[in-house]
Amino acid sequence: MPANLSSALETFKQQRDAAEAHYLKANRVSVFFREYTAAVETLLAALWAEYFQNSALCLMAVGGFGRGELYPCSDVDLAVVSPAPLSDGIQEQIARFVQTLWDCKLMPSVKSGSVDELCESVRNDITGDTAFLEARFLFGNRQTADKLAEKMNAQRNVAAFVEAKLVEMEHRHAKSQGSGAVLEPNIKSCPGGLRDIHTLLWIAKAQGLATDLPDLLKQRILTRAEAGMLSHGYRRLAHIRIHLHLNAKRAEDRLLFDLQPQVAESMGYEGLNLRRQSEELMRVFYRAIKTVKQLSGILTPMLRSRVSSAPMRVTLRIDDDYIQVNNQIAARHTDIFFRRPEHIFKIVEIMQQRNDITALEPQTLRAWWGATRKINRSFYQNSENRHRFAGFFRNGNGLTQTLRFLNLYGVLGRYLPAWEKIVGLLQHDLFHIYPVDDHILTVVRNVRRLALDMHSHELPYASALMQSFEKQDILYLAAFFHDIAKGRGGDHAIQGIADARQFAADHFLTGEESDLLAWLVENHLLMSAVAQKEDIQDPDVLDAFCKRVQTHERLSALYLLTISDIRGTNPKLWNAWRASLLESLFHAAGRYLTGNGGNPHTLFGRRRQEAADLLTRAAVPEKQQKKLWNALGSAYFARHQSREILWHAANLVHDFETPIVRSRILFKSDSFQVMVFMPNGPRLFARLCRIFSRHGFDILAARAFITEHDYILDTFIVQIPSQHAPEDYPDIQSALEAELNSFIHGHTVAETQSHSRRISRRSRYMPIAPSITITPEEDYPDWYSVEITAVNRPFLLADMAEVFFAHNVSLRYAKISTLDERAEDSFTVFSLDLKNPKIQSSLKQTLLEQLS
C-alpha cells in the first residue's frame, strides 16, 4: 500500500476510534453516524484520488451509507458509475480499488457499471432499486451522478415500488416467527425493527416526500407526537445495534444470548445481575419495536393510499357517529374520541361485534390512538367504559384480535396499570419464549380456540368440554389475569388474586364469578404441577388435589386453562405425553369428586382384580396367577396403574424368572413405553438411562420397582427424537429393544460419559440456578421426595441415579418434567440413612455438583 494511503488508513482508524469513544461518552446516535460516516468518506477520498483522479467516473454512497446511517461493522455500500460501458482496463482498476477497501477492513459492497447498465440491473430488483433510492454523490463526475439519479427516478413505478416494499415487509415478518426469532431477535429485520422504519421512509421518499422524520413532520405526514415517538423508538433500536456491533466486533444484528449481557452492561444497565440486565435490555427492545409497529400500522396505509389505486369505495351507515368504508370503520368526525372519550371503547366494540369490519380507517385510527393517550383514572371509573371492557370478554367473538389491538396501541396498559408493568417483560427461565404480555394473549387465544367449533379437530375432548362450559368469559378473564403479577418478586399467583378481585368488583362480576376468577388465578399452576411432578396413581396425591379443587366446575376450568397455558408458553412443551397426563388427572379427579374414587385398599384391590380377570380370560390358571402376585408383592399395586399392571401381567405370568424387555408405542404419541425385567444388580437404573440418552430419547417418566424375589421391574416413558417421522418408529423400536436385550442378558454395553454432554447457547448464557429440596414422606418412614430444578441436558437422569446409588439411596420412582431447556424432576427414594442431617447434606451437595 502506498505511503500516502497508509497515512490515510491510519487517520481513518484514529477518526473511527474517536467516533466510538465520543459515542460511548455522549451516547448520541446522530453524532456517531456523522463522525463515523465522515471518517469513512475521508478514507474513500484518498483512495479515489489514488485510483481515479481526473476520471469520468463518479463514486456514490448508496444504501445505509447513502443515508448516513453507518453502523460500526456494517457494509459500506458504494456504486462506481460510468457515463459509458466500462472498459477492461477500468474494470481492473475498479477491482484493485475494491481490494484495497477490503485491505482497509471496510467490508465494501460495490456495484459498478454505466448509467444504463445500473438502471437496467435494478429494473426488476427491488433491493437494488431501494439502495439507489438512497444514493448520495461522493467524488468524481457529478454530472454522471445526476444523470443516474434522474434516470433511476424516471424509470421507477412508484405505486409498484410501494407495493413491492410492503410485500417484502410481510415476507420479512413471516420469517421472524418461532422461538429463535423471539428469544434472539434480529434488531434490523424483526417486526417493528429498524428495517420497518426504513421502509416507511423509502415509501415516502419514492413519492417525492421528505427523507427524514423532522421533514415529514414539516410536511404534515407525521404529527408532532408521532414524529417524537418514532424518533425515540428509532434511537433506542439504533443504540442497541451500535452496541451489538461494538461488543460482537462483527456485523451481528441478532440479540444473541451470549451478547445480551454484554450489550446490557455497555448500555449502562448497572446494579442488576446479568440476567436482570438482559431482561431489562429486552424489555426496552420490545417496547421500542412496539412503538414502531403502532406507527407503521397508521402511516403505512396512509402513505400507500397516496399512490395506490383504491378499490371501489363502498360506504354504509352504521349509526350517527360511524360509517363502514369497505371493510373498515370510520368516524364521521374524528374529534369524537376527544369530545366523548367513551367512544374509545365503543368503536372497538362495534368492530368486535361485526365480522365484516376488520380495521379502523387510517385517519380514524390516528385520531383514536391520539385520544387513547388521554386515558386516565376518570376514564377507568366511568361505568360505561367498564361495561364495554368487560363486554369484550363476554362477547368472545374476535376477542384475541381485540385484545392484541388494544395491547399494540398501549390501551391495555393505560386502562389497567398492572398490565403496563408486564409489557415487554421477558423471563429468562429456559422455557418461556414470549414477553409476558404476548404470552398472556396467546393463552387467551388458546382458550378462545377451544370454544370455536372450527378448531375442534386440534383438541377434540377439550374443545367439547369448553363448548359446554357455561362461564366462558370467566375463563377468558382467568387467562388474561393468570400472569399479570409477574415481575414483582414473590409468588405471582398469590399476588395476582388482588388484581383479579379488584377487576371483578369494578366490572360488575357476581360474587360467584369473582370467586372462580380469583381461584383460577391463584391455582393456575396446580394441575400442571401435580400431573407432571407427582404420582397421580397415588391415592394420597389425588385426594390432596381434589381437596384443593372441590368442584367439577373448577376442575373443568382449571383443565382448560392449564392446556391453554402450556400451549402458549412454548410450542415445544405441548406433546401427547403431557396431554395424556393432564387428561388422566382430569378423569381421575372427576371420578373422585363424583364419589367413585374409592379408598386406597379398594383401589388396589380393583387393579389386581382387573388383571386377574384378563389372565383368566386368557386361560391362565389361578395357581399361576397367584405365584405372579406373590412375586410382585402387594406394594406393586400401589405403585402402578391398571394399564401398566395389565401389560406387565400379560408378559410375566408364564415366566417371571427370565429377563425380558418389552416396548410399545403409545397411542397417538411420539413416545414409547418400555418395561425392563431382570435380576437386581448395582447401577442398573442409571445404566438403562444412559442407553436411552445415547439413542437420543428424552425420558419423560420412570418407575423403578423391586419385586419380592429381587428382580427389577422398571418402566419408562421415553420420547422419540423429533427428527424422526412416524414411519421410522418401528425401526427405532427394534433397535432400542435389541440393545436393551443385549444388556439384560449380560452383554457389555458401552457407557457414554456425561462429560460429552452439550447444552444450548441459551442455557449457557442464561442458566438457572439449580435447586434441590428433600422432604420426608408423611406416613412412610424412610421414604423421601426429592425435587430438582436444573438446566436440562442429556444423561441428567442417569447422573442423578448414579449419585443416589453412591449414597446408598434406592430410587423407586422418577417423574421427569422437561420444560424445553429446563428440567423439573421429582424422585421418590428410600433410604435408611437420610434421616441423618450430615448424610442428607452430603447427598444435596453431590447432586448440586452434578447439576452445576
Curated annotation (Swiss-Prot):
<keyword id="KW-0677">Repeat</keyword>
<feature type="region of interest" description="Uridylyltransferase">
    <location>
        <begin position="1"/>
        <end position="318"/>
    </location>
</feature>
<dbReference type="InterPro" id="IPR006674">
    <property type="entry name" value="HD_domain"/>
</dbReference>
<dbReference type="InterPro" id="IPR003607">
    <property type="entry name" value="HD/PDEase_dom"/>
</dbReference>
<dbReference type="InterPro" id="IPR045865">
    <property type="entry name" value="ACT-like_dom_sf"/>
</dbReference>
<keyword id="KW-0511">Multifunctional enzyme</keyword>
<dbReference type="InterPro" id="IPR043519">
    <property type="entry name" value="NT_sf"/>
</dbReference>
<protein>
    <recommendedName>
        <fullName>Bifunctional uridylyltransferase/uridylyl-removing enzyme</fullName>
        <ecNumber>2.7.7.59</ecNumber>
        <ecNumber>3.1.4.-</ecNumber>
    </recommendedName>
</protein>
<keyword id="KW-0548">Nucleotidyltransferase</keyword>
<dbReference type="GO" id="GO:0006808">
    <property type="term" value="P:regulation of nitrogen utilization"/>
</dbReference>
<dbReference type="GO" id="GO:0008081">
    <property type="term" value="F:phosphoric diester hydrolase activity"/>
</dbReference>
<dbReference type="InterPro" id="IPR002912">
    <property type="entry name" value="ACT_dom"/>
</dbReference>
<keyword id="KW-0808">Transferase</keyword>
<feature type="domain" description="ACT 2">
    <location>
        <begin position="785"/>
        <end position="852"/>
    </location>
</feature>
<keyword id="KW-0378">Hydrolase</keyword>
<feature type="region of interest" description="Uridylyl-removing">
    <location>
        <begin position="319"/>
        <end position="672"/>
    </location>
</feature>
<comment type="similarity">
    <text>Belongs to the GlnD family.</text>
</comment>
<dbReference type="GO" id="GO:0008773">
    <property type="term" value="F:[protein-PII] uridylyltransferase activity"/>
</dbReference>
<feature type="domain" description="HD">
    <location>
        <begin position="436"/>
        <end position="558"/>
    </location>
</feature>
<dbReference type="InterPro" id="IPR013546">
    <property type="entry name" value="PII_UdlTrfase/GS_AdlTrfase"/>
</dbReference>
<dbReference type="Pfam" id="PF08335">
    <property type="entry name" value="GlnD_UR_UTase"/>
</dbReference>
<feature type="domain" description="ACT 1">
    <location>
        <begin position="673"/>
        <end position="757"/>
    </location>
</feature>
<dbReference type="Pfam" id="PF01966">
    <property type="entry name" value="HD"/>
</dbReference>
<comment type="function">
    <text>Modifies, by uridylylation and deuridylylation, the PII regulatory proteins (GlnB and homologs), in response to the nitrogen status of the cell that GlnD senses through the glutamine level. Under low glutamine levels, catalyzes the conversion of the PII proteins and UTP to PII-UMP and PPi, while under higher glutamine levels, GlnD hydrolyzes PII-UMP to PII and UMP (deuridylylation). Thus, controls uridylylation state and activity of the PII proteins, and plays an important role in the regulation of nitrogen assimilation and metabolism.</text>
</comment>
<keyword id="KW-0460">Magnesium</keyword>
<dbReference type="InterPro" id="IPR010043">
    <property type="entry name" value="UTase/UR"/>
</dbReference>
